[in-house]
Amino acid sequence: MAKKVDKVVKLQIPAGKANPAPPVGPALGQAGVNIMGFCKEFNARTQDQAGLIIPVEISVYEDRSFTFITKTPPAPVLLKKAAGIEKGSGEPNKTKVATVTKDQVREIANSKMQDLNAADEEAAMRIIEGTARSMGIVVE
């Protein structure tokens, strides 16, 4: 018989840098998870993606065991990396902070495809372009 899921914890953690300090420790401690076990496993699984923020969904079972799924980094993080900027514009409709090419948008859309609610590559690109627009990034 399959184990029954007790809780689902969603976090965004820098790749390879999970440690028992907040926000990871308190969130997992409340769920009764072995915090160091999670941190070691997460860091091993994400060490090749250093510098990116990785969303993770942790399923905690009734017997306090857990499994987790790592997702692709959020689109704004990938857009900031592609554009080479620290943060988006405070007034995106007035102040443009950077420019990305269609090819960069296509690359981001392809990497995010599994997490986006899009039927095809074009729809995924439109989603990423909308995110870029709301950050004050121009798509050429």
UniProtKB/Swiss-Prot annotation:
Span of the signal peptide: none
Instruction: Give the matching Pfam families.
Output: Ribosomal_L11, Ribosomal_L11_N
Which GO terms fall under biological process for this protein? translation
Q: Which domain of life is it from?
A: Bacteria
Q: Which InterPro entries match?
A: Ribosomal_uL11, Ribosomal_uL11_bac-typ, Ribosomal_uL11_C, Ribosomal_uL11_C_sf, Ribosomal_uL11_CS, Ribosomal_uL11_N, Ribosomal_uL11_N_sf
- Matching Gene3D superfamilies, A to Z? Ribosomal protein L11, C-terminal domain, Ribosomal protein L11/L12, N-terminal domain
What about PTM? One or more lysine residues are methylated.
**GO MF assignments:** large ribosomal subunit rRNA binding; structural constituent of ribosome
Cross-referenced CDD domains: Ribosomal_L11 (cd00349)
Keywords of this entry: Methylation, Ribonucleoprotein, Ribosomal protein, RNA-binding, rRNA-binding
A GO CC annotation given for this chain: cytosolic large ribosomal subunit
Q: Which PANTHER family match?
A: 60S RIBOSOMAL PROTEIN L12, LARGE RIBOSOMAL SUBUNIT PROTEIN UL11M
In which family does this protein belong, per the annotation? Belongs to the universal ribosomal protein uL11 family.
Role played: Forms part of the ribosomal stalk which helps the ribosome interact with GTP-bound translation factors.
| HAMAP family according to UniProt | Ribosomal_uL11 (MF_00736)
Recorded hits in NCBIfam families, A to Z, give: L11_bact (TIGR01632)
Oligomer status and interactors: Part of the ribosomal stalk of the 50S ribosomal subunit. Interacts with L10 and the large rRNA to form the base of the stalk. L10 forms an elongated spine to which L12 dimers bind in a sequential fashion forming a multimeric L10(L12)X complex.
Output this protein's name.
Large ribosomal subunit protein uL11
